[in-house]
Amino acid sequence: VCTPIAGKLTPVPRTATFERPVSGGDALLSIGSLLIGAIAVVAAVVLLVGVFDLNWVLGYAIPLATAVFAVALWQSLSRRGWTWKDLQLTSGPRSLWHLLWEVPVAWIAAMSVGIALAGAVDIAPASDAGGSASTLDALDVGVVAGTLTIACTVLIAPVLEEVLFRRVIFGWFDTRTRWQIAVLGSAVCFGAVHVLPAIALIMVCIGSAAALLVRLHRSLIPGIALHTMNNALATAAVVASI
């Protein structure tokens, strides 16, 4: 965007969402941490399935993946010189009290659009939405596995995924293009990791809503709040179905 000054066009500086810009190296190493977590789970299942019962191994899959992902993500960012402050887990210029109505409205709107789009292209949500099979496996194994899985799904995973998809990937797009494109780009990446077409489409909408809230507040907290609410409702639905 340019404005005329003294007969010349000069670029108008954009207001970045985050204080610290994201480099290509930051993004690549952070994405690599997610892959490391996935590989660790596959390797653990292959190695342990002959030693322990398959249901027991699958019951601890989410806690294992979350732990490996957390360590790998933090190591990748800390090696790049990132600190807790750089994650911007603080309130921005807009009061966080607005989240009391913004998060529910954003979730309802995102889910409505996502389900409508899934219906329009004739792909129905699968029964394993939000990793429900893994949650049920954990609950079948016992209280410890079930509690760890629910805690990871509802509390820990949303923080880690928001750091990756909103702080890093959205931040990378945001420093290179318009914020609207950054919202869509990070949301598509977020949806892609959910694999199943219907779930991926809905997660694109959830990711877009989270990115919009992050952009509005200039803080990662709104994205975490929306992500936590989504996972909590999905987990509650799974537990209620038992």
Task: Annotate each predicted stretch with a short phrase.
Residues 122-125, 177:
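Glycine-centered loop/turn motif at secondary-structure junctions
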Residues 85-87, 134, 188:
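Flexible, active-site-adjacent loop/turn segments at secondary-structure boundaries
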Residues 130-140:
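Perimembrane loop-to-helix junctions flanking transmembrane segments
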Residues 1-115, 119-123, 232-242:
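N-terminal, membrane-interfacial amphipathic/helix-forming hydrophobic leader that caps
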Residues 108-112, 138-242:
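Transmembrane helix-loop-helix hairpins at the membrane interface
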Residues 124-131, 163-166:
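Short, structured loop/turn "capping" segments at alpha-beta junctions
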